[in-house]
A protein has these predicted regions:
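Glycine-rich phosphate/adenylate-binding loop and adjacent beta-alpha elements
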Residues: 1-55
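A glycine-rich, Thr/Ser-enriched phosphate-binding loop motif common to dinucleotide/cofactor-binding enzymes
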Residues: 34-39, 59-84, 95-106
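Short glycine-centered segments of the SAM/dcSAM-binding site in methyltransferase folds
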Residues: 94, 190-191, 217
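Adenosine-nucleotide cofactor-binding segment
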Residues: 94-100, 112-181
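Residues in the short beta-alpha loop(s) of Rossmann-like NAD(P)-binding domains
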Residues: 123-126, 198, 224
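C-terminal hydrophobic helical "lid"/dimerization subdomain
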Residues: 156, 180-184, 225-284
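Helix-to-beta-strand junctions that scaffold the AdoMet/dcAdoMet cofactor pocket
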Residues: 186-188
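Rossmann-fold NAD(P)-binding glycine/threonine-rich loop
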Residues: 196-215, 232-234
Length: 284
């Protein structure tokens, strides 16, 4: 759990500044009293130390397990809203999602709920990730373990999409090679949204000439603001029976062995979302 606790010392906050970086704070367990978040039954929040902190109550009939998906889903919703405000995402658009991890699959669902006409997911492996992406609404998937050449993947996406390319491509993988590949999947005048680089994966080598010649919009999206979070909670609640949300999660106990196995399986892409629970009742 990485709670984004929003402060309000700047006028940009009240004015709904679109960039949360300047006044958002991530809190780790290194700061006293060491109970800011993580795999715990309770979280300590000092409202005097962190004035303006927003706390949202989940609906009474929403499980904590389902509610745990609100944070990553909200990030996806905000990324599409960013594109929409910039004129790069409209009802009926064709969307390509790069990445089939938890963010990628949640982005597939968000794209569907926010009006995308067609959604294609590029990622791996087939089991459990690409199969689940299709269950969440991806019309087609492209397996990068089977189609290993970037040029072949670009050609395959264009074959599926037809015409001149996708209206919007969103990177949810965070891999440095995704950007150069993704912009070639776009139609001229399309929009590329980078939301996968939430850790520094290094420099991305691409020709900016292609961005110019294709007349592209390129946007970055970082996390979400406190005003965005209710959108994620609301979508989960409204569609709780529409999408197989809980199939994303593989449950592990909060033990030394359980945590180690959860991380190991996630790194090996054997799970979509390794979920560590502090007490068994959470999964009932």
């Amino acid at each position: 759990v990485r709670p984004l606790l929003l402060l309000h010392p700047f006028p940009q906050t009240a004015n709904k500044c679109l960039t949360p970086v300047y006044y958002g704070r991530y809190l780790g367990f290194d700061k006293a009293p060491h109970m800011w978040g993580g795999w715990a039954e309770y979280v300590y929040v000092d409202l005097e130390m962190l004035p303006g902190t927003k706390i949202y109550k989940l609906p009474d009939d929403m499980s904590l397990r389902l509610g745990a998906l609100s944070e990553p889903l909200t990030s996806c919703i905000r990324a599409f809203n960013r594109a929409s405000r910039a004129g790069g995402f409209s009802w009926g658009d064709t969307v390509v999602i790069q990445g089939s991890g938890p963010i990628g699959i949640l982005a597939v669902a968000a794209a569907r709920e926010m009006g995308a006409g067609r959604v294609i997911c590029v990622g791996a492996p087939e089991e459990p990730r690409l199969k689940l992406a299709r269950e969440f609404g991806a019309e087609a998937t492209v397996n990068i373990q089977e189609i290993k050449s970037p040029q072949e993947r670009i050609a395959r996406v264009r074959e599926i999409v037809g015409g001149f390319g996708a209206d919007l491509v969103m990177d949810c993988s965070g891999h440095p090679t995704a950007g150069p590949e993704g912009i070639e999947m776009l139609r001229d005048g399309g929009t590329y949204v980078e939301m996968g680089q939430f850790t520094d994966a290094g420099s991305i080598e691409t020709s900016w000439h292609r961005i110019c010649t294709k007349d592209l919009n390129v946007l970055g999206s970082w996390g979400f603001t406190g005003n965005d979070l209710p959108l994620g909670v609301d979508m989960l609640y409204r569609t709780r029976d529409k999408y197989p949300w809980l199939k994303m999660q593989t449950i592990y106990p909060f033990t030394e062995e359980g945590v180690a196995q959860a991380v190991k399986d996630a790194m090996a892409m054997k799970t979509v979302k390794s979920t560590i629970v502090p007490w068994p009742e959470l999964v009932e």
